[in-house]
C-alpha cells in the first residue's frame, strides 16, 4: 500500500514537473515565434513594396522617355510630321494606361494618397506638358521660337518631376525601407533619377541649338548640373 502511494506521489510530482517544463518552454518560445512571424510579415510587406516601387519607377521612366517622340514631332519636317504624331499618340496611350494601372496597384497596397497624386496632380502636369508640345507642333514653322520650344520641354520636365514625387514618397512611406531589402529601394530610385538626368543634359540646350541661338545661361547651367548629378549618381 505504501509503495503504491509513493508511486502515485512520484507520478504526480513528475506530472507537475512536466507541466512546469512545458509552460516554461512556451514562455520561452512564444516571443521567438512572435518575432519570427513579425519578421516574416515585414519581409512579405517589403517584397510587395519593392514590386510597387518597381512599377512606379517604370512609369516614371516611360514618362521621361515620352520626351523622345515628343521632340521628334517638334523637330520634324512637314513630310514626316504626320508619321511622328501617330507614334507619339500611341506612346501617350500606353503611358495613360500605365498611369491607371499603377494608380490601382497603389490603392490595392495601401498607398492611397500616392494613387491620388498619380491620378490628379500627375495627370494635370502631364496634360500641360502635352498641350505645350502639341501647341508648338501646330505652330507654323515661320512663327516658331526657341522660347516656345523650351517652354514645351520644361513642361515635360515638370511632368516627370510630378511622377518622381510619387516614387520618392512611396519609398519614404514604405515599411521595408529600413529592412535588409532597403538596398533595392535605393537602387530603384537612383536608377530612375539617373535615367532622367542623363536625358535632360541635351534637352536643356535643344531649343537654342535648334534655332542656332546662343544657349541661355540658365539652360547651360541646368545642363551642366544634370551632367554632374548623372555623374555622381
Set out the residue ranges of the language-model regions.
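Hydrophobic alpha-helical segments
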Residues: 2-233
Amino acid at each position: 500500500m505504501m509503495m503504491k502511494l509513493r508511486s502515485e506521489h512520484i507520478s504526480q510530482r513528475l506530472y507537475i514537473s512536466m507541466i512546469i517544463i512545458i509552460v516554461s518552454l512556451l514562455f520561452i518560445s512564444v516571443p521567438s515565434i512572435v518575432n519570427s512571424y513579425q519578421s516574416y510579415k515585414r519581409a512579405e510587406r517589403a517584397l510587395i513594396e519593392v514590386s510597387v516601387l518597381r512599377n512606379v519607377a517604370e512609369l516614371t521612366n516611360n514618362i521621361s522617355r515620352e520626351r523622345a517622340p515628343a521632340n521628334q514631332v517638334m523637330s520634324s519636317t512637314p513630310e514626316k510630321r504626320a508619321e511622328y504624331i501617330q507614334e507619339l499618340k500611341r506612346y501617350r496611350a500606353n503611358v495613360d494606361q500605365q498611369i491607371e494601372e499603377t494608380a490601382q496597384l497603389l490603392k490595392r497596397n495601401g498607398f492611397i494618397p500616392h494613387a491620388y497624386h498619380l491620378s490628379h496632380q500627375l495627370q494635370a502636369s502631364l496634360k500641360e506638358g502635352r498641350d505645350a508640345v502639341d501647341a508648338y507642333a501646330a505652330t507654323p514653322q515661320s512663327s516658331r521660337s526657341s522660347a516656345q520650344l523650351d517652354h514645351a520641354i520644361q513642361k515635360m520636365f515638370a511632368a516627370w518631376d510630378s511622377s518622381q514625387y510619387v516614387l520618392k514618397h512611396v519609398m519614404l512611406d514604405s515599411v521595408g525601407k529600413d529592412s535588409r531589402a532597403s538596398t533595392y529601394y535605393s537602387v530603384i530610385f537612383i536608377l530612375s533619377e539617373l535615367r532622367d538626368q542623363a536625358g535632360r543634359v541635351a534637352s536643356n540646350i535643344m531649343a537654342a541649338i535648334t534655332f542656332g541661338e546662343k544657349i541661355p545661361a540658365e539652360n547651360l547651367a541646368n545642363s551642366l548640373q544634370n551632367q554632374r548629378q548623372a555623374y555622381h549618381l
